Amino acid sequence: LSFRHVMGRLAKVLLENVVDREDGPRLTQQDLAAMVGTAREMVSRSLRSLEDMGAIKSEGRSLRILNPDLLRDLL
C-alpha cells in the first residue's frame, strides 16, 4: 500500500473518531493501525506528516484536529 493511500484512510479515521475534548476517546497508534489496516509504524509516520502539514496536533497521548478541511482533502 502506498503512503498516500494510508494517509487518506488515516484522515478518515481521525475525522470520524477524534473528539477534541478531555474526556474523548484515547486511541493508541496500535488502535489507529488496526482501524486503518496498516502497521503501527506507518501510522506513526503518517501522524508526523499530518502534524508537519498543520492538520493535527499531538499533545501527549491525545490528538487534536487543527485543520479538518486539510484532512478531508486527503480522502
What are these regions (language model features)?
Residues 6-9, 13-75:
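Phosphate-/nucleic-acid-contacting segments
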Residues 1-5:
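A small-molecule sensor/coupling module
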